[in-house]
Amino acid sequence: MSKKTIVSMAVIRRLPRYHRYLEELLKNDVKRISSRELSEKMGVTASQIRQDLNNFGGFGQQGYGYNVEELYNNLTKILGLDKTYNTIIIGAGNLGQAIANYTSFEKSGFNLKGIFDINPRLFGLKIRDVEVMDIETVEDFIARNKIDIGILCIPKDNAQYTADRLVRAGIKAIWNFSPIDLKVPDDVILENVHLSDSLFTVSYRLNEEELFKKLKGETAKIDG
């Protein structure tokens, strides 16, 4: 299980997209936009956008649309991006290092405080001035540095055990890149990220037309 949400996850997953697009509009000095214009750009119906935003009070004006800066600032607060969060990465392999090197997270308030691994040869390695440390010290580090989020980038064999350790140490949320769906207490936030899911979606779309041609042909044979 994971901590329950008040608003549906489908709505929550659309909010970062709205926020990202509004940020681009601000950079292009766009002052206002209608829900219809927003829907055309994002591939979501205008009705869906209004319904999503109404979960948080609604921000548009009849006949005017949305003030881009105001809506962006409101979504920043709704997403909790007006706050800062202390994070650690478990796993200093290629994926862990790639995430550690992604500076945009810090710009959004996610401050990387430590990186942990089981490989002694990696201890002391610095990635953007953040040192790789022994995983056996992680509980003490979490307590001393008030860590909010643990980012798991380790093989699935050790993922659940490591997640349990983080939870016992007081971690509030886990962003899991290990290829396994973890189980955590109801009061812990868990986001499982399976990178292969997106790639498999791409492969499906590449083959979709051919797939349905075959299915249509097989159906025609049966009917004949």
From Swiss-Prot:
Gene Ontology biological process terms from the UniProt entry: negative regulation of DNA-templated transcription; response to redox state
Binding site for NAD(+): 91-96
Family assignment from sequence similarity: Belongs to the transcriptional regulatory Rex family.
Cited function: Modulates transcription in response to changes in cellular NADH/NAD(+) redox state.
Keywords: Cytoplasm, DNA-binding, NAD, Repressor, Transcription, Transcription regulation
PANTHER family, per database record: REDOX-SENSING TRANSCRIPTIONAL REPRESSOR REX (PTHR35786), REDOX-SENSING TRANSCRIPTIONAL REPRESSOR REX 1 (PTHR35786:SF1)
DNA-binding stretch(es), residue numbering of this chain: 17-56
Domain of life: Bacteria
Example GO molecular function: DNA-binding transcription factor activity
InterPro entries documented for this protein: CoA-bd, NAD(P)-bd_dom_sf, Rex_DNA-bd_C_dom, Tscrpt_rep_Rex, WH-like_DNA-bd_sf, WH_DNA-bd_sf
Signal sequence segment: none
Compartments where located: Cytoplasm
Assembly mode: Homodimer.
Database matches in SMART domains: CoA_binding
Protein name: Redox-sensing transcriptional repressor Rex
Lineage, broadest ranks: Bacteria, Bacillati, Bacillota, Clostridia, Thermoanaerobacterales
A Gene Ontology term for the protein's cellular component: cytoplasm
